[in-house]
Curated annotation (Swiss-Prot):
Domain characteristics, as noted in the entry: The RNA-binding motif binds to the RxRE, a complex secondary structure consisting of four stem loops and a long stretch of stem structure, present in incompletely spliced viral pre-mRNAs. This region also contains the NLS which mediates nuclear localization. These overlapping functions prevent Rex bound to RxRE from undesirable return to the nucleus. When Rex binds the RxRE, the NLS becomes masked while the NES remains accessible.
Family listed: Belongs to the deltaretrovirus Rex protein family.
Chain positions covered by the region annotation Homomultimerization: 57-71, 124-132
Protein's UniProt name: Protein Rex
Protein source organism: Human T-cell leukemia virus 3 (strain 2026ND) (HTLV-3)
Lineage of source species: Viruses, Riboviria, Pararnavirae, Artverviricota, Revtraviricetes
Subunit: Homomultimer.
Biased composition (Pro residues): 96-117
Amino acid sequence: MPKTRKQRSRRPKNQRPSTPWPISQVSDRAFSTGTLSTFSATVYRPIGAPFLGGFVPLGYTAMPYWPRAPNIRLPGTPSMDALSAQLYNTLSLDSPPSPPRELPAPSRFSPPQPLLRPPRFLHPSSTPLKNTPPSETIALNSPWESSCQPCPSPTLGSDPKTSTPCGEAPLCAFTSISSPPP
């Protein structure tokens, strides 16, 4: 009976034996965290060595720290705390918002600006009022007048839902769908 060999579990070559400290801090290379900073990365070198009975607790020669931000405030400007307190006092929820300031009076050298009004398109069948100002009589000539006929009176056979009621702006294709052709 031939002897069978035991399959040994091979460890990959790139796997190292475990150490009590992280591998990235053992090397003498600069250890960077990947963030952009103005100072160089700190080099970690472990102090202490393993001996037969156990391991000496480790210490580090350099510890990273964040430098204090320089005071860039110019003399005479209030600090952020004073500004935030002032802002909080002016924008308290109890007080109503201040009314908007009125526009300055127009100077006598500039011509008065006319206020813009939206044009009112009236149906051609409705008669314009006699006291209409001349600025609104121009708007009475609606763009639908030249291309469409006035709204036809609904006949008995037409459906009131499909025909456009008089008084609204008629659309050319949908003035009356169900009315018979002439």
